[in-house]
Amino acid sequence: MASPAPPEPAEQGSPALAAAPQAPPPPTRAPPEEPEGAAPPEEGAAAGAGRQVEEAAGGVAAVVTWLLGEPALWLGGRADELLSWKRPLHSLLAFVGANLVFWFLALTPWRVYHLISVMILTRVIMQIIKDMILSRTRGAQLWRSLSESWEVINSKPDERPGFSHCLAESWMNFSIFLQEMSVFKQQSPGKFCLLVCSVCTFFTILGSYIPGVILSYLLLLCAFLCPLFKCNDIGQKIYSKIKSCLLKLDFGIREYINQKKRERSEADKEKSHKDDSELDFSALCPKISLTTAAKELSVSDTDVSEVSWTDNGTFNLSEGYTPQTDTSDDLDRPSEEVFSRDLSDFPSLENGTGTNDEDELSLGLPTELKRKKEQLDGGPRRSTEKKSAAGLSLPLSSDQTLHLMSDLAGDVITAAVTAAVKDQLAGVRQALSQAAPSLGEDTDTEEGDDFELLDQSELDQIESELGLSQDQEAEAQQNKKSSGFLSNLLGGH
């Protein structure tokens, strides 16, 4: 809806030209009467010069008013609309124009009178265009008068604060700041002087690093952008959006940190459990150092030392000594002591039948008991010989070598005694071969397996060459020798 407004007369043309016909004609002045004792002509000339200066100043003021008055008034009326960004397109164009004018004035090499000439030329062109557009038809004047008489009122309430309100609020805040600073100056002038000097020093340093043109342009930007942010609550909208994003980010970071804490606690629990299990295992299975074990094993075979059980589950042996156990008395020379102890029981009889040393080692035991003993000792003897032969090829320490050599010596002596006994009893077994032929075959087989002097093929060849008669004669002679030895040994039995 529209409301009538008081009509205002509008005249076309420049303000100076329009005001000229409306101004009343100056009243005619009567020629001044010369008072008595008129002033000299020099004073009249000075008064005329003063009037000319005043007229020239009035003309310059009229020209300046014509040149800048109407644009200034137009910009003043439109400033509220442009700076409040009610019409974004107009405000954007004004912002671009202000930037162009600023950088033109800042970068142009022209002098001041060149700039003034350009401003006057621009104003004349604007006035000509205005007269041509508004004075083309008569209806334009009528329409202009109606449009100025009636004003359109927007029924929608504008919730945004106006530019005048923003300016008023800013001016009020600035006035309050000045009042507080004046009170602060009265209460503590020294602190006020120090504060002012600090601010001036700050701006001096800032101006030495940043040119004044940049600072002026920043002021221009603030003049356009601060009302935009303040009147449209852009800062509040941006803050609300950023706050929502920050809340989401805070929640995400908090959840991530809590998850990492849970994972770290679980890892610590597993590590502690693993450490406990490792401690249990280490208690059950102690670790033995290789150097310590080698040092403990590097012992001599000369002296005997006591054995002590260490904490790590090994024997503690002093260097240069061998361990002593309950059964270590018979480990050095067991078979030699047994042989020397029983050697006195062997008969030392010379029967004049041409017997050799092997006949003297015969024990004269019954044939059946000796055969059973040979059958029982045949298998273990071969295994011990194989073990002793295999053990010689291994790298052994001194005590192990001593035990091995003692065992080997005992085995050799036992084998020699057994061989001698078998040789003496071979004749008796061959004499009984007719009653038990299988017994003679077993004896021949055992003799061949024990001594292994010839291969089986060589024995077969020798038997084929000599014949059975020679074998039978040798067996008869052997029976005579063995029977003579046994009769002398057993006596009246």
From Swiss-Prot:
Basic and acidic residues bias spans: 330-344, 368-388
Example GO BP: negative regulation of neuron apoptotic process
Topology, Cytoplasmic side: 1-55, 109-114, 226-493
Keywords annotated in UniProt: Autophagy, Endoplasmic reticulum, Golgi apparatus, Membrane, Phosphoprotein, Transmembrane, Transmembrane helix
Motif extent (LIR motif): 449-454
Primary localization: Golgi
Residues bearing the modification Phosphoserine: 145, 147, 149
Localization in the cell: Golgi apparatus, cis-Golgi network membrane; Endoplasmic reticulum membrane
Ranges annotated as biased composition (Acidic residues): 441-463
Name this polypeptide is given: Reticulophagy regulator 1
Organism the protein comes from: Bos taurus
Gene, per the UniProt record: RETREG1
